[in-house]
Amino acid sequence: MNVSVLGCGRWGSFLAWYQAAVLKNSVKLWGEAGRKSFEQLKREGKNEYITLDKSIDLTSDLQSAVSSAQVIIISISAQALRSFLPEVTKFDLAGKIFVLCMKGIEEGTGKRLSEVAAECGIDPQNTAVWVGPGHIQDFLK
């Protein structure tokens, strides 16, 4: 399966590693060029918790990450979701499954993040939410 993880902080990089190393999916990990987490992964291939599987395609090309994926995992700040999704929804999303991997509600509206995604054009029928332990260390044990 082709999976893209949008957001390459600790949680996003862990999810990409898990998808590639454990589940053996084909994975693209997207991050914004210039951000500390992306630049560290690009330079070192690792962060303080995981070393990226060599099969992971680390990219700052959002169109490539979205277009190639069957499943799109979003792992960014919950408060950035509404402003980020218009960048995603300008691409063809037909048949793509979205997994929101962030906790919380939208400040100011009190809306669940799945509601925010729907308002931004993500099909609610193709949206799942994955939250778990607050720290990736819990998964690495």
Predicted regions and their residues:
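A short, aliphatic-rich alpha-helical micro-motif
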Residues: A65-S67
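Short glycine-rich, polar/acidic loop-and-turn segments at beta strand-coil junctions
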Residues: G31-A33, L62, A78, P133
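NAD(P)+-binding Rossmann beta1-loop-alpha1 motif at the extreme N-terminus of oxidoreductases
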Residues: M1-S60
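Rossmann-like NAD(P)(H) cofactor-binding subdomain of soluble oxidoreductases
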Residues: L52, V71-K141
